[in-house]
């Protein structure tokens, strides 16, 4: 049983001789030549720690311009961007080295913060189309070009493992495309066995040979007495015509409508659209035939309304004249009586 080294106290700084216990307990990737190259050559000072910044001692303030410039400068070093380019799925060890390099320059940022910061800058540069350029756009473009991130954002794909079910679209395509291949192979194997070994083929008949010759037997005329006779001693099985695998003949293991369904499946959608359009046009013709008489009836009703309006005007004028005449006659009669 391996004994883990005792964790150093939080208040005591890590010594140069002993690396941080968190790095060793996490079981990180061992130091390679690229790691040694990253820690040497201007990035590491003599006597500085090589461990990344822990979340407890990291800064929680927003990134400043100096911190962003140091982060991009660290990522643009060949050891860093080559490590990110070689292993895209496991970028955390590389960002641990970036965090350690920034810690030596008095920037306390965790590996996750460094990764999120670069992703934020990359997305912001992609979204800033037609806007004025920022102070770090050239470095971000250079880093994106080195890492191959200058194209459109990638769609994350998950590899189908042994325990992961396949998607429905892929399974249906794989079920349709390579389905006839095993049938043809199974049909070719018995034929080769019959040609190579005639006697065992007659003695032991497999189900595959029976199923392969079922279509030939059903389509051929009924057997006569000569066909039922056993073969002659000198007559071998090779003299009989061997059935050649014909792609037009349906195999017994394949459903009868599968080959026709494959040929007509691309034409199903256009036929259904044409049928729907024809039905729509037929319904529109029926509607027009129904609306024609209704239009005639509405025009007739409009004429009747006009006639009724004229007769109503005449009736009103006659009534008004009758009322005025009766009033005038009453006035004349009353005037004569008073005189």
From Swiss-Prot:
Signal peptide: none annotated. Residues 171-193, 218-229 have a biased composition (Low complexity). It is found in: Nucleus. It comes from the Eukaryota. Residues 261-270 have a biased composition (Polar residues). GO terms for cellular component: nucleus. GO terms for molecular function: HMG box domain binding; TBP-class protein binding; transcription coactivator activity. It holds the Pfam family Myb_DNA-bind_4. Phosphorylated. Residues 154-170 have a biased composition (Basic residues). The modification Phosphoserine is found at residues 15, 18, 48, 54. Expressed mainly in pluripotent cells with expression rapidly down-regulated upon cell differentiation. The keyword 4Fe-4S does not apply. GO terms for biological process: positive regulation of transcription by RNA polymerase II. Residues 279-310 are annotated as: Leucine-zipper. InterPro entries: Myb_DNA-bind_4 (IPR044822). Residues 1-62, 144-270 are annotated as: Disordered. Keywords: Activator, Nucleus, Phosphoprotein, Transcription, Transcription regulation. Binds to the N-terminal region of ATF2. Associates with the TFIID complex through interaction with TBP. The leucine-zipper domain is required for coactivation activity. When this domain is deleted, the protein is able to stimulate transcription from a number of gene promoters. Acts as a transcriptional coactivator of ATF2. This is Undifferentiated embryonic cell transcription factor 1. The gene is Utf1.
């Amino acid at each position: 049983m391996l004994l883990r080294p005792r964790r150093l106290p939080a208040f005591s700084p890590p010594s140069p001789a002993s690396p941080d216990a968190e790095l060793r307990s996490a079981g990180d990737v061992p130091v390679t030549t690229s790691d040694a190259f990253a820690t040497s050559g201007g990035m590491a000072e003599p006597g500085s720690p090589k461990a990344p910044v822990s979340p407890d001692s990291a800064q929680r303030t927003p990134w400043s311009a100096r911190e962003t410039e140091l982060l991009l400068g660290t990522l643009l070093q060949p050891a860093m961007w080559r490590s990110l380019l070689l292993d895209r799925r496991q970028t955390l060890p590389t960002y641990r080295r970036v965090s350690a390099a920034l810690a030596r320059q008095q920037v306390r940022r965790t590996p996750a913060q460094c990764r999120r910061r670069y992703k934020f800058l990359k997305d912001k540069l992609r979204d800033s189309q037609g806007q004025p350029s920022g102070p770090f756009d050239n470095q971000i473009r250079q880093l994106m070009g080195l890492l191959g991130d200058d194209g459109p954002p990638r769609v994350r794909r998950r590899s189908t493992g042994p325990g992961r079910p396949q998607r429905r679209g892929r399974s249906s395509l794989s079920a349709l495309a390579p389905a006839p291949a095993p049938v043809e192979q199974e049909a070719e194997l018995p034929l080769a066995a019959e040609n190579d070994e005639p006697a065992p083929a007659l003695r032991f008949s497999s189900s595959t040979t029976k199923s392969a010759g079922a279509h030939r037997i059903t389509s051929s005329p009924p057997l006569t007495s000569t066909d039922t006779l056993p073969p002659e001693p000198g007559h071998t099985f090779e003299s009989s015509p061997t059935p050649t695998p014909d792609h037009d003949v349906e195999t017994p293991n394949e459903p009868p409508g599968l080959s026709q369904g494959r040929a007509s499946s691309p034409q199903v959608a256009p036929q259904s659209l044409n049928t729907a359009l024809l039905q729509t046009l037929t319904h529109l013709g029926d509607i027009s035939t129904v609306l024609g008489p209704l239009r005639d009836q509405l025009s007739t009703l409009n004429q009747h309304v006009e006639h009724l309006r004229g007769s109503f005007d005449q009736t009103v004028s006659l009534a008004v004249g009758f009322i005025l005449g009766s009033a005038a006659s009453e006035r004349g009669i009353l005037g004569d009586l008073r005189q």
